[in-house]
Curated annotation (Swiss-Prot):
Source organism phylogeny: Viruses, Varidnaviria, Bamfordvirae, Nucleocytoviricota, Pokkesviricetes
Glycosylation: residue positions: 100
Major localization listed first in the record, in broad terms: host cell
Pfam families, per database record: v110
Name recorded for this polypeptide: Protein MGF 110-6L
Length: 122
């Protein structure tokens, strides 16, 4: 009975706090290869990270939505980390982005380099 009560109390607390269900939790040391189950979260807010793409023969396929782009300066190596409620992107060269994990914000300084692949352009 106590277990059920604590479970319900925990569920109510997460709803009151408004924590997204897909929000990663815990600590994540800096990595260029985040856990597979967190890819959707990390790629939603900084889509040019190299770990979001599968690149071969000059084209890159997005691991989340399947979109295809030409490989260029848009796809960049980056590392991500998490401490408490701070999620951080490190794009090297002194470019960083920090956000509250529970209130994420999209950010992409390379968005102008994105070039969609079109089937007719062979």
């Amino acid at each position: 009975m106590l277990v059920i009560f604590l479970g319900i109390l925990g569920l109510m607390a997460s709803q009151v706090l408004g924590l997204p269900s897909n929000q990663p939790t815990g600590q994540l040391r800096p990595t260029e290869d985040p856990p597979e189950e967190e890819l959707e979260y990390w790629c939603a807010y900084m889509e040019s990270c190299q770990f979001c793409w599968d690149c071969q023969d000059g084209n890159c396929i997005n691991k989340i939505d399947g979109s295809v782009i030409y490989k260029n300066e848009f796809v960049r190596p980056c590392s991500v980390s998490r401490w408490m409620d701070k999620c951080m992107y490190d794009l090297n060269k002194g470019i960083y982005h920090t956000m509250n994990c529970s209130q994420p914000q999209s950010w992409n300084p390379y968005k102008y380099f994105r070039k969609e692949w079109k089937k007719d352009e062979l």
